[in-house]
Structure formats: C-alpha cells, structure tokens
Regions:
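N-terminal beta1-alpha1 ligand-phosphate binding loop
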Residues: 16-45
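A generic structural motif
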Residues: 43-49, 153
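Helix-loop-strand module that forms the ligand-binding subsite of alpha/beta enzymes
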Residues: 67-151
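N-terminal beta-loop-helix "entrance" segment that forms/cooperates
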Residues: 53-69, 168-173
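Glycine-rich phosphate/pyrophosphate-binding loop and the adjoining helix
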Residues: 15, 19, 150, 154-192
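Cysteine-centered motifs
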Residues: 5-6
C-alpha cells in the first residue's frame, strides 16, 4: 500500500479585492463602524482595502494635468479593486461634499482630454450602504446610485440603510439589530 500525500496551496491572488470607501471624516463615524462589521463578516473570503482619499485636491481643471499624485494613487486603487463598497452618511438629503469630489475625479478620463476612453470606475461593481438619521440614508443612496450609474459603474441593486436609534448619537456606538446584521451579511455575500 502506498501513501500519496499532496499539499494544497491557496493562492490569495485569486481572491477578490473589495475597496471600502468611507464617506464620513468623523473619528467615531457610524459608517466606519459599519465597514468594520462588514470586514468581520467577510473575514478571509476576500481581500479588504480601505481607500484613503483625505489628501485629494478639489477637482479643478487647472490642476488636472499633470495628474496630481493623490489622484494617481486613488485611481490605481480603484482600478485594482474587483468591487467598491461605499459606507456613507447622508448630508442634507444627499452625499458628503468630499465624497462627491472623489467621484468627480473618478469620472474624469485617465488619458488627458480623451473622453472616448473608459474612466477607472467604468464597469466597476459598487455596493451602497449607509448609517444615519431616520431616513436611513435613502436620499444619499438614491443620488449615489443615479450618479454612479451615469458614470457607468455597475451599481448593485441591493443596498443597506441603517436608521440610527436616538441614543446612538450620544454614545457614538453603532449597534445593529439581528435584522440589520442579516441584511449586512446578505449584502456582503453579493459583493464577494
């Protein structure tokens, strides 16, 4: 009788890369907490990266070329990701200004003034979620879906909106109900 031994090698390069984009700058952001919970749910089934776009300049065609270093870094991160997952609050029924600035940069052609070529977000799968007031970021997510679709991103139909209970605003702690956690798990499965 002979014994055959084999070794299984897991190649992490075949694992999907999901780029988290946090739409809040707040240190104790509920949306960062939501992203952290999503990261826990996904575990080792995908590679998670978080986009740092805090140094992105305001979009201005006067500084668009040569491409600013921060813009090149952000575009590269977007291009390398298999999917994007936005976690964002709602400001005045819409998305935060710094998130809009990021999306404006992503809508610009990578090749200067060549509007016939795809942008770095064309065809990119995008999931939308947010934690906020009683509207559960519905206005923000609807406007983001419209904008991202216009930008030719592939926006997932399933979204997640969390209406924070009043006490969360004084504790700065995001607590999910069983139903909300199940919805987050379902969205994570569709992103992976």
């Amino acid at each position: 009788m002979s014994l055959i031994c084999c070794r299984i090698v897991i190649n992490n390069s075949s694992m999907n890369t999901i780029l988290f984009i946090i739409g809040s700058l707040r240190a104790k952001s509920f949306n960062r907490q939501l992203a952290d919970k999503a990261r826990e749910i996904i575990g080792g089934r995908a590679q998670i990266k978080e986009l740092d776009y805090s140094d992105l300049p305001l979009l201005n065609q006067d500084v668009e070329q040569p491409e600013p270093v921060a813009v090149a870094r952000v575009r590269k991160a977007i291009q390398e990701a298999d999917a994007l997952w936005l976690f964002t609050p709602e400001y005045n029924g819409s998305y935060p200004g710094h998130l809009k600035n990021l999306l404006d940069w992503l809508s610009r052609p990578v090749k200067p003034m060549d509007y016939g070529t795809p942008t770095c977000i064309n065809g990119k799968r995008v999931a939308l979620s947010g934690a906020g007031g009683k509207a559960a970021t519905a206005g923000c997510r609807a406007k983001l879906a419209e904008l991202l679709t216009f930008m030719k991103a592939d926006v997932l139909p399933q979204q997640l909106g969390i209406a924070l209970p009043p006490e969360a605003w004084s504790t700065d702690v995001l607590t999910l109900t069983d139903e909300q956690l199940a919805q987050l798990k379902a969205l994570a499965e569709s992103v992976i």
